[in-house]
C-alpha cells in the first residue's frame, strides 16, 4: 500500500451533527489544495474517528500512524464529547502517547467546545491549549467560523512541516503586495484585520507602511521578507504598471515562493505584466463585511501548504535519486529558465505534465540556448 505524505484524522462525538458537518467540510477543502490543473491537485486524505469500531468497545477505530509520514489529529471538542469524556480521554491519551514516540513527525490540533467545556483530562495535564471557539462570537456566519477553523489548521500544519523540513529558516510572513494608487485600502484592511486583537490566528504580515524603519534600505528589506514568505498580490487596475509591484512579484517567483493573486480590478489593465501569470487568482469583492478577508487568507495558506507538501516530496525524491534539480511548485515557464545558473540537470514540477503548446515553447528555448535541462513531473522522477 502506498504511504501517504500527510493524513488528517478528525475526532468527534458520533452524535454531534455540527462536528460531523465540520468534518465533511474539511474533506471538501483538503480534497484539492491551491492550484489545480486539468483536474489534478494535491489532495490530503481526511479520515474520521467517531463511531465505535468493535462490538462491545465504545472507542473509535485505532489510528495507524505508520500509514503516513505525517499525521494531523484534529479534535472537535463539544458538550456531546464531554458526555463520554472517559472514553475520549483514554482514546486521545493512548493516541498522543503513540505520537510521542514518533520523533515529533505528527501534529495534534484540538478545537475547544463552543460552550467552553473543560479540556480532556489528558490534555489538561499536559497544559494543551485548545483553539477557543467560544470566543468566535464576532464571526457572524457559519461560513466565517468554518474559515477561522481552517486558518488555524492550515497555519499549524504549515508551521509543523517547516519545523521538520526547514527548521533553521525564519518565520514566514504574509507579504501583502499592492499598488498605493488603488490597492492600499484593500491591503490595509487585510493587515488591520489580521493584527486585530479579536483575531486569534497568529499570522504574521508585512505591510511596508507599518514595517519599514527610518534609514532602512527598503529594497533589501522587501527582498528579505519576500524570499521567506507567502506573497499575496492585490492586483488592482494599476498593479501591473507599478515597478515596485513588478519587483515584488518577480522576486517571489524567482525564489519559488507561494503566490496568490487577489483580483480587485474594476476598470481595465492597460498592459498585464508578462510574468504575472501561471499563478492561482481569486476574484475578490471588497465590502464592509470582513468575510472576504478570511476567505482570501484561506486561499493564501492553502496554496502555501500545497507548495510546502510538493517541495518536501520533490526534494526527498531528488535526494534519493542523486539529482541536482531545480524544484518549482508551479508548472515551468520561460522565466524559470533564467533563474538557475545552469548547474541543475533536471527541473521537477507538479503533475500533470505540461500540455503540448507550453512544452514546445520551453523545449525550443532550451534547444536555442544549448542548455541541457530535463523537465519532469514528480511522478516521472524514478
PLM regions with names:
Residues 115-130, 218, 267-282:
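Glycine-rich, charge-decorated loop segments at or immediately adjacent to ligand/cofactor-binding or catalytic sites
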Residues 81-85, 117-123, 242-243, 268-274, ...:
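Switch/connector loops and helix/strand junctions flanking conserved nucleotide-binding motifs
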Residues 1-78, 86-103, 135-230, 253-258, ...:
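Conserved N-terminal substructure of TIR/SEFIR domains
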Residues 109-114, 234, 262-264:
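Generic beta-sheet signal
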Residues 269, 283-310:
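Charged, amphipathic alpha-helical linkers/stalks
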Residues 226-242:
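Catalytic-site beta-strand/loop segments enriched in glycine and acidic/polar residues
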Residues 127-145, 278-290:
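Short secondary-structure boundary motifs at beta->alpha junctions and helix caps
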Amino acid at each position: 500500500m502506498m504511504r501517504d505524505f500527510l493524513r488528517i484524522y478528525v475526532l468527534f462525538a458520533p452524535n454531534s451533527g455540527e462536528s460531523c458537518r465540520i468534518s465533511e467540510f474539511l474533506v471538501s477543502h483538503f480534497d484539492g489544495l491551491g492550484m489545480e490543473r486539468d483536474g489534478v491537485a494535491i489532495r490530503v486524505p481526511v479520515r474520521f474517528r467517531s463511531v465505535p469500531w468493535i462490538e462491545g468497545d465504545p472507542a473509535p477505530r485505532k489510528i495507524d500512524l505508520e500509514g503516513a509520514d505525517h499525521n494531523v489529529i484534529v479534535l472537535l471538542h463539544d458538550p456531546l464529547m464531554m458526555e463520554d469524556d472517559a472514553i475520549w480521554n483514554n482514546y486521545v491519551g493512548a493516541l498522543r502517547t503513540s505520537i510521542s514516540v514518533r520523533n515529533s513527525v505528527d501534529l495534534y490540533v484540538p478545537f475547544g467546545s463552543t460552550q467552553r467545556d473543560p479540556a480532556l483530562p489528558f490534555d489538561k495535564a499536559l497544559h494543551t491549549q485548545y483553539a477557543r471557539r467560544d470566543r468566535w462570537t464576532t464571526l457572524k456566519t457559519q461560513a466565517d467560523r468554518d474559515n477561522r477553523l481552517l486558518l488555524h489548521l492550515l497555519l499549524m500544519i504549515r508551521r509543523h512541516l517547516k519545523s521538520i523540513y526547514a527548521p533553521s529558516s525564519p518565520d514566514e510572513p504574509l507579504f501583502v503586495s499592492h499598488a498605493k494608487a488603488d490597492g492600499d485600502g484593500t491591503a490595509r484592511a487585510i493587515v488591520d484585520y489580521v493584527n486585530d486583537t479579536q483575531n486569534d490566528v497568529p499570522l504574521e504580515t508585512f505591510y511596508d507602511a507599518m514595517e519599514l524603519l527610518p534609514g532602512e534600505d527598503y529594497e533589501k528589506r522587501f527582498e528579505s521578507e519576500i524570499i521567506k514568505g507567502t506573497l499575496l498580490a492585490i492586483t488592482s487596475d494599476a498593479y501591473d504598471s507599478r515597478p515596485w509591484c513588478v519587483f515584488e512579484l518577480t522576486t517571489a517567483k524567482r525564489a519559488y515562493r507561494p503566490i496568490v493573486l487577489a483580483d480587485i480590478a474594476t476598470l481595465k489593465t492597460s498592459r498585464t505584466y508578462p510574468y504575472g501569470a501561471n499563478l492561482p487568482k481569486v476574484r475578490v469583492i471588497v465590502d464592509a463585511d470582513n468575510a472576504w478577508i478570511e476567505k482570501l487568507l484561506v486561499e493564501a495558506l492553502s496554496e502555501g501548504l500545497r507548495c510546502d507538501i510538493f517541495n518536501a516530496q520533490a526534494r526527498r525524491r531528488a535526494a534519493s535519486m542523486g539529482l541536482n534539480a531545480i524544484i518549482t511548485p508551479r508548472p515551468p515557464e520561460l522565466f524559470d529558465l533564467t533563474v538557475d545558473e545552469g548547474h541543475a540537470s533536471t527541473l521537477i514540477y507538479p503533475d500533470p505534465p505540461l500540455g503540448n503548446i507550453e512544452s514546445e515553447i520551453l523545449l525550443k528555448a532550451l534547444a536555442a540556448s544549448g542548455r541541457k535541462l530535463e523537465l519532469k513531473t514528480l511522478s516521472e522522477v524514478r
